[in-house]
Amino acid sequence: RGLGDVYKRQINNGDFVRLNFTGKIKENDEIFDTTFEDVAKEAGLFDENKEYKPIPIIVGGNHLLPAIEEAIVGLEAGDSKTIEIDSENAFGPRNKQLIQLIPMKEFKRQGMTPVPGMKITSEGSTGKILTVNGGRVKVDFNHELAGKDLIFDVDVTEIIDNDEDKIKSMIELHYAAPNMDINKTVIDIDGDVVNITLDDVAKFDQKSYMDVTFARFRIAKDIWENMDFEKVNFVDSFEKKQEEDEEEAEE
């Protein structure tokens, strides 16, 4: 890439970067997340709906744990680092108050049969069923990694400097659609205004209207806060396709 091959610089806060990572629980080396497909398969974490590749983030943008983003400041593209994070700076300590007993009748009312290990959502919080005894169900609403010291192996693959590529990276991060081709997304920059026309696949996304709105807001917010733009427009246009009539075409 011309100068990009010989010019290296250190990562600063506010930089847009791509990185690979594998996250493990320190006490037993159990892998709980990774961007590598082969590692995910070996760990029994593989998800066919997930695309395994370096993820884009803004350093200091709270896209990953703050301790990870702080630790990669000063690295260069191509650098690797092992980052140890204690529970206080990861997902916090376990809170006994978040372990609750819920009457069985609440589950029956919703047509659910609770079993240990099942995940449920209540009042916006996700919990895991620990035990089912008689008329009571014990549910743990702590984050699954609460109270755990963690290790992250991080590989920085790229520092993104081009404005259009930065914008596309935030679309990749926040508007994850498996079949969307980011290269078909059109970015038009007009002064301090960014106009984004997403790939046609995004127009027929099965996400709820609220999810789509939140995703677009997060993209716009990251652009406002980390780039020199004041307004972000998302353009949805539907164009009539001009089909060639072969029968009337002149030979």
Predicted regions and their residues:
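Short amphipathic alpha-helix segments
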Residues: 163-179
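Short, non-transmembrane amphipathic alpha-helical segments
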Residues: 205-231
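Short Gly/aromatic-enriched secondary-structure transition segments
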Residues: 30-46, 98
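Extracytoplasmic beta-sandwich strand-turn segments characteristic of Greek-key/jelly-roll folds
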Residues: 42-62
